[in-house]
Amino acid sequence: MSIIEMRDVVKKYDNGTTALRGVSVSVQPGEFAYIVGPSGAGKSTFIRSLYREVKIDKGSLSVAGFNLVKIKKKDVPLLRRSVGVVFQDYKLLPKKTVYENIAYAMEVIGENRRNIKRRVMEVLDLVGLKHKVRSFPNELSGGEQQRIAIARAIVNNPKVLIADEPTGNLDPDNSWEIMNLLERINLQGTTILMATHNSQIVNTLRHRVIAIENGRVVRDESKGEYGYDD
């Protein structure tokens, strides 16, 4: 059974822009897929629809067992336990420590303190930053901040991880570190969808490639190439 099932999805914005034009995509549990395409093609809308940041206008969409067309507002937090999100600009809370940033994702769903401490230290170990547990975001490099953002995104053991340009603000060395981390997370069974403009990553670490242009899926290939000029 697909963990993401999108059928004939249409999204129009109030300014008249049609961002998605009849998009259909099926993703199986444990897949790693890149979302590629030129700027303004609809990638962001596609990604944001998967965690209900954007509500679609037509079609059907289910993610991790949730029907995103019929989902009630009160159930959106439940969806977001099953779908972790990593952003290009990290979105860490500047006045909270590394520990507090990650723990917050568990506190909001009512986890007890013992489980929070155990799990936060587990994910910090996974991302290689246990020694930064008491640091604040402004004391970290960009690569370290993104690793903490990934730790926060996976702390609740989501079935799906959405990564929106996760290497976009990073130098090549840090970009490869982030990709190696995402590969390890994927090998543990987490489904990953990653929007990117980085041709070198896509062409080197081969996975499924879903290309979007003008709001439509124009290419969907197993172990595909990037296919655009940077």
From Swiss-Prot:
Record's subcellular location: Cell membrane
Residue numbers binding ATP: 37-44
Recorded GO MF terms: ATP binding; ATP hydrolysis activity; transmembrane transporter activity
Reactions catalysed: ATP + H2O = ADP + phosphate + H(+)
Cellular component, GO annotation: plasma membrane
Disrupted gene: phenotype observed: Depletion causes reduced growth and failure of cells to separate after division, forming chains.
GO BP: any one term: transmembrane transport
Record-annotated ABC transporter domain positions: 4-229
Gene3D superfamilies tied to this protein: P-loop containing nucleotide triphosphate hydrolases
InterPro entries for this protein: AAA+_ATPase (IPR003593), ABC_transporter-like_ATP-bd (IPR003439), ABC_transporter-like_CS (IPR017871), ABC_transpr_LolD-like (IPR015854), Cell_div_FtsE (IPR005286), P-loop_NTPase (IPR027417)
Pfam families xref list: ABC_tran
Key word Magnesium present: no
Keyword Cell cycle: yes
PROSITE patterns in the record: ABC_TRANSPORTER_1, ABC_TRANSPORTER_2
Keywords: ATP-binding, Cell cycle, Cell division, Cell membrane, Membrane, Nucleotide-binding, Transport
Top-level taxon of origin: Bacteria
Membrane-topology descriptor: Peripheral membrane protein
Intrachain disulfide bonds: none
Family according to the record: Belongs to the ABC transporter superfamily.
Listed NCBIfam families: FtsE
Function statement: Part of the ABC transporter FtsEX involved in cellular division. Has ATPase activity. Essential for cell division and viability.
Subunit-level organization: Homodimer. Forms a membrane-associated complex with FtsX.
Name this polypeptide is given: Cell division ATP-binding protein FtsE
